[in-house]
A protein has these predicted regions:
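Structural boundary/hinge residues at secondary-structure and domain interfaces
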Residues: 1-161, 166, 209-268, 272, ...
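Solvent-exposed coil/turn segments that connect beta secondary-structure elements
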Residues: 32-34, 119-123, 177-179, 185-187, ...
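Short, solvent-exposed coil/turn segments at beta-strand boundaries
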Residues: 111, 156, 174-180, 281, ...
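Short, exposed beta-strand/loop patches in secreted or surface proteins that constitute
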Residues: 149-153, 171-174, 273-276, 418-423, ...
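A conserved glycine-rich beta-strand in the N-terminal activation segment of trypsin-fold
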Residues: 168-245, 433-513, 519-522
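Flexible, glycine/threonine-enriched loop-and-boundary segments that flank and lead into catalytic domains
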Residues: 376-378, 421-436
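C-terminal regions of mature proteins
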Residues: 397, 524-551, 555
Length: 559
């Protein structure tokens, strides 16, 4: 009987979804179990703390278990059984772009071609019926109740096509064996059918994917891969999009876009991502693959230093937006080392731009061309963002104050500004008349470069033992950082988790919410912490947070 129960409750064997994805795809996202996603989310600390306060029913937590059980046994409505068994690959096969103009100026309208490829683990007839039913429902939702239906044949597979109100809009569905494909373009469906049938190579044959997938985990709840071709295609649009956020001047937009294009094309060659539920939260890993000559050039100067006690955190107040710690050997000479490594490996345009950037950076901090800081600074630099329009504050461990003193004087006097000394809580603060409100102060072994008000908050945090270094939630997640982490970032705000949970409450019509209980529960939700390492093949970042990218649920729900 036990053997019978084992086979009756065993999940259908998983298929390798990358064998359904065409090699020509720009990117794909893989989800192997929806029930695992539901079960993982409802087991997070954020869900367990906030769901009761928002009146979200326990039935949602049990839904994942029920779906998994129906998927294993095959008992239940066809759609429910398939939901419990299905594996999904979202495939990006292409991106079209067109320029447009609006009230706020010109912008780029991107139109991705994508396909949802679903392994139903069911019969061909059931998969075909499901494809037709779901495609018709989606078409009505997208185009209205009055829809037209067309059919065509592609190597024996029947394509169901629903034309949209414009020639460039359509919804297409097809099935192949137990696989269902639904897409916004017929070419995407045909490309996926070619891969599934063996008429075209699949992304499973991609050497980078085979070699590096293990770096982010082979059994993640969510996995994604952007190919080298995908990176190159995205780079065509990304610089212009980023530049338009930096400036509104057309000439400067063009300059920034061209520079970004030069650097990105010569640097990145792929991206891998995974998300997994661990320790009451979500662990996400990002591996940005770099071209071999660039990876070594970046990894060497950004080699992590032996991690100290991160004493700078005792100066960081709890009421901040986030902080980032740079823990790198010889941090004082980092810009020059990076420049020395990168310039020989990029083209002339990018090389000149990098030189100008380093010169400008040194000048901003009062450094003359002959100044060298390597032996004057420690390995710990902390950047603190207080939020809003406030400038970023910097905390630097200093080993040689006399060497730093003339540089600090030039920093405070930049642009002809005058500096004056004031005392705050027993600490001398040098305040500049510069328009950006810059000021400086030494507290113990650390130099603070910030505004006068920010420095006061840091002095108070240190004097009252109220810095984030005393936060038990932070201490817990800092217990086991990757050994080679050169950058550590922390974000205490967990509003993204709250917004996700409120979206779930709205969709499920839960309630009423207990506001006071919700605020208390939110204080117990773990903050976000990430670690970045630079390796000889790329950059890997591990993020540990309350809900991770699943916070996008709030956007999908329109909340």
């Amino acid at each position: 009987m036990g053997v019978s129960a084992y086979f009756a409750l065993r999940r259908p064997p998983r298929v390798e979804m990358d064998r359904y994805v065409p090699a020509s795809a720009l990117a794909y996202v893989e989800i192997n179990s929806f029930s695992d996603i539901v079960g993982g989310l409802t087991s997070t600390k954020a869900w367990q703390e906030l769901a009761p306060a928002l009146g979200i029913p326990d039935e949602i937590s049990r839904a994942g278990l029920a779906a998994d059980l129906m998927g294993r046994t095959g008992v239940g409505r066809d759609e429910a059984v398939i939901a419990g068994r299905a594996q999904l690959a979202l495939v990006l096969t292409g991106i079209e772009a067109e320029g447009a103009a609006g009230e706020e100026g010109a912008y780029i309208n991107l139109k991705p071609r994508f396909a949802a490829v679903v392994e139903t683990h069911s019969s061909h007839d059931l998969a075909r019926r499901l494809a037709e039913k779901q495609a018709a429902a989606l078409a009505r939702e997208a185009f209205g109740e009055s829809i037209n239906e067309e059919r065509s044949d592609y190597f024996g597979a029947q394509l169901l096509i629903f034309p949209g109100p414009r020639p460039d809009r359509q919804l297409v569905a097809a099935s192949a064996g137990s696989v269902v494909i639904i897409s916004n373009h017929i070419a995407a469906v045909e490309t996926c059918l070619d891969a599934i049938s063996g008429r075209a190579p699949t992304i499973a044959e991609n050497a980078t994917l085979s070699e590096r997938r293990g770096e982010v985990g082979t059994d993640a709840a969510v996995f994604a891969f952007v190919t080298e071709a995908g990176i190159e295609r995205l780079i065509e649009f990304l610089p212009a999009l980023l530049a338009s956020r930096v400036t509104t001047d057309p000439d400067r937009i063009s300059t920034v876009a061209n520079l970004s294009d030069h650097l990105l094309k010569q640097t990145a060659s792929g991206l891998l991502y995974s998300a997994q539920f661990e320790s009451g939260g979500v662990t996400e890993k990002y591996l940005t693959l770099l071209r071999p000559n660039m990876a070594a050039a970046i990894a060497d100067p950004l080699k992590s230093a032996t991690r100290a006690n991160l004493e700078s955190l005792d100066l960081v107040p709890s009421q901040i937006e986030d902080f980032t710690i740079l823990n790198v050997e010889g941090v004082g000479e980092l810009p020059d080392r990076m420049l020395k490594q990168l310039v020989p490996r990029v083209d002339v345009v990018a090389g000149l731009a990098l030189r100008e950037f380093v010169v400008s950076l040194r000048k901003q901090f009062g450094l003359e061309p002959t100044d060298r800081l390597g032996d004057a600074l420690g390995n710990e630099v902390t950047l603190v963002r207080f939020g809003g329009a406030e400038p970023t504050a910097m905390i630097v461990r200093v080993k040689d104050r006399p060497k730093i003193a003339p540089i600090l004087d030039r920093y405070l006097a930049e642009g002809g500004a005058k500096a004056s000394a004031v005392e705050y809580n027993g600490v001398q603060v040098s305040v500049s008349s510069h328009e950006d409100g810059r000021a400086a102060a030494f507290v113990g072994e650390f130099l603070i470069l910030a505004t006068r008000d920010q420095i006061a908050k840091m002095i108070d945090a240190h004097a009252n033992n109220a810095g984030v270094g005393r936060d038990e939630r932070l201490a817990q997640v800092l217990n086991s950082p990757p050994a080679r982490a050169a950058i550590i970032s922390y974000k205490p705000d967990v509003r993204d988790a709250a917004e996700m949970m409120m979206a779930v409450a709205a969709v499920t019509k839960s309630g009423p919410a207990d506001q006071s209980a919700g605020e208390a529960a939110l204080a117990r939700v773990p903050p976000s912490l990430s670690f970045t390492e630079f390796r000889d093949y790329g950059i890997i970042t591990e993020s540990r947070s309350a809900v991770g990218s699943f916070s996008l649920i709030s956007s999908l729900a329109g909340k």
